[in-house]
Amino acid sequence: MSAVITPAEFNDYKVADISLAAWGRRETIIAESEMPALMGLRRKYAAEQPLKGAKILGCIHMTIQTAVLIETLVALGAEVRWSSCNIFSTQDQAAAAIAAAGIAVYAWKGETEEEYEWCIEQTILKDGQPWDANMILDDGGDLTEIIHKKYPAMLDKIHGVTEETTTGVHRLLDMLAKGELKIPAINVNDSVTKSKNDNKYGCRHSLNDAIKRGTDHLLSGKQALVIGYGDVGKGSAQSLRQEGMIVKVTEVDPICAMQACMDGFELVSPFIDGENDGTEASIDKALLGKIDLIVTTTGNVNVCDSNMLKALKKRAVVCNIGHFDNEIDTAFMRKNWAWEEVKPQVHKIHRTGAGAFDAQNDDYLILLAEGRLVNLGNATGHPSRIMDGSFANQVLAQIFLFDQKYADLAPAKKAERLTVEVLPKKLDEEVALEMVRGFGGVVTKLTKTQADYIGVTVEGPFKPDAYRY
């Protein structure tokens, strides 16, 4: 293992450096002041202890903001065991602070793939045996999949999983369709206070930050291609426009494509007439030959494929802000081109062939975070105020599922409850209200007459489930 720890009385952890705990604690205290919804829930439910008896397996980016989430879950009665869902996203001072607080955590920045899986296994196991967990909190679906495939007996006691991100939700829905999902799931990703905050506004803040930290480039006046215009793509395009970049967007969904046009972005395709036949002949080389930066945002595979990578402008920056590293064909890059590490999570990819390279060669791409999440690999991710909404949703989702006690139901009832659903809108509004209060905002209350006129209660929820914010 590459991580080093300092032995102590509590040893159910593995982090990079336990001496970073004081630094992590100082940052956590600051983060708490920027997370009003999460801290509001901590105060609101402290006496009730709604998670007393909950034993939560967590796999989500081990950042300072996650430390606030973990300690909120613990404050509301839960026991937790934690790992990170990405090999580069851990903030080592955050992991150290959690370990120093006596909470089991296995995470450090720069894990290998083998170490990543080992860390997840260590949270599942306690004293060498499967822990008697009864809840899962996941980001991306790796933990959920491992439990289903390697430790299926644990599922008999687990009440459900709350999933943070688009990719993980897709995996859950796929498992449900195939009859493989054995526990109910809450789709946290599609809560309005998650998707509109984290996916859109968070990426607007953190994408340009990561690119500038990784490259020290001035972005203004350069051309960028954003692949995908969902919520993450929207925030990413805004992030680059803020820097003065000339931003183009490519999309497969006509509705998202229309939105890109309406928002003033040029809609293009890296493929001639939009058709990818898998050959270099289908590539719009004139377009890609002018692109200085390409960002993938889709959650799909090979959206920046080998033929596109060959056609990109010399010295173009390539990065991904989707969950996994397969959006960019990094496998092709590793097999066919030479990699030169400039600094951690920044590589020059020499397109002159594999093996030896000329350091003065100018035909290279700059790849950030090895094609993984750039905002967490090259920077510190979304700000605390953004993650406040996402993590408040996670807390409410954990309370909601734990209260349902799925594992204790009769088989017939279990069949009815085996679903992947979003949080009730009333809980989404609860998170939003706490966030508004954190900004010092004042929400106007409906009169009884007004509420009756539009067919809602004075307390809400205020919109139908089908409403698109």
Swiss-Prot record:
Pathway: Amino-acid biosynthesis; L-homocysteine biosynthesis; L-homocysteine from S-adenosyl-L-homocysteine: step 1/1
Residue positions binding NAD(+): 165-167, 199, 228-233, 251, 300, 321-323, 375
Subcellular location: Cytoplasm
Cofactor: NAD(+)
EC code(s) of this entry: 3.13.2.1
GO molecular function: adenosylhomocysteinase activity
Top-level taxon of origin: Bacteria
Catalyzed chemical reaction(s): S-adenosyl-L-homocysteine + H2O = L-homocysteine + adenosine
SUPFAM superfamilies linked to this entry: Formate/glycerate dehydrogenase catalytic domain-like (SSF52283), NAD(P)-binding Rossmann-fold domains (SSF51735)
Cofactor: how bound: Binds 1 NAD(+) per subunit.
InterPro entries per UniProt: Adenosylhomocyst_ase-like_sf (IPR042172), Adenosylhomocysteinase-like (IPR000043), Ado_hCys_hydrolase_NAD-bd (IPR015878), NAD(P)-bd_dom_sf (IPR036291), S-Ado-L-homoCys_hydrolase_CS (IPR020082)
One GO cellular component term noted in the UniProt record for this chain: cytosol
GO BP, sorted A to Z: L-homocysteine biosynthetic process; one-carbon metabolic process; S-adenosylmethionine cycle
EC category name: hydrolase
Binding positions for substrate per the UniProt entry: 63, 139, 164, 194, 198
Signal sequence interval, chain numbering: none
Keyword Hydrolase in annotation: yes
Keywords: Cytoplasm, Hydrolase, NAD, One-carbon metabolism
Pfam families in alphabetical order: AdoHcyase, AdoHcyase_NAD
Role this protein plays: May play a key role in the regulation of the intracellular concentration of adenosylhomocysteine.
Similarity remark: Belongs to the adenosylhomocysteinase family.
PANTHER family: ADENOSYLHOMOCYSTEINASE
Protein name according to UniProt: Adenosylhomocysteinase
